[in-house]
């Protein structure tokens, strides 16, 4: 009887695990949150992380396409862009970077070489950077309301300069 109960519990755990694994699989291109069809008539901008997509979309609405380099759920410290992302990046007019995260420190030179006409905007310009207890700069600038205000101002200014309509 105990062995039968053990097998039922073990089977249930295995089935639940398989269901969870399958549910976590994604369709579409994760770097653009599944938005496959970008409007070719709209300018395209690229951001490093999802919170910055939100900022751009709140400022520009549907007037620009927004690509995200580090997909939701990926680590911005260790993520490596896909070849397709590098191709798509060349269509961006702007790259709105966070300023101090690992992905940008590692990849920014290569991203700029790949898209030499793309203008890189450091959205942390004007933000007083905080240091962690270990003395490193805290890259999570968007978490502060004051800093988010500066970030969105930097984004809005760049977009208005290039796309005044």
Where are these predicted regions, by residue range?
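Sec-dependent N-terminal signal peptides of Gram-positive bacterial secreted proteins and lipoproteins
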Residues: 4-27
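Extracytoplasmic metal-acquisition and chelation regions
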Residues: 20-165
């Amino acid at each position: 009887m105990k062995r039968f109960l053990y097998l039922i519990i073990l089977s249930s755990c295995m089935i639940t695990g398989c269901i969870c694994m399958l549910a976590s699989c994604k369709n579409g291109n994760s770097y653009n949150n599944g938005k496959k069809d970008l409007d070719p008539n709209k300018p395209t901008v690229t951001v490093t992380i999802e919170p910055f997509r939100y900022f751009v979309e709140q400022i520009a609405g549907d007037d620009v396409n927004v690509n995200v380099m580090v997909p939701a759920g990926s680590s911005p410290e260790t993520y490596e862009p896909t070849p397709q992302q590098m191709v798509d990046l060349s269509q961006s007019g702007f790259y709105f970077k966070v300023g101090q995260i690992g992905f940008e420190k590692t990849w920014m030179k290569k991203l700029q070489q790949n898209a030499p006409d793309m203008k890189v905007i450091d959205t942390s310009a004007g933000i007083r950077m905080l240091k962690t207890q270990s003395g490193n700069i805290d890259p999570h600038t968007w978490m502060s309301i004051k800093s988010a205000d500066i970030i969105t101002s930097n984004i809005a200014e760049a977009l208005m300069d290039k796309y005044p309509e």
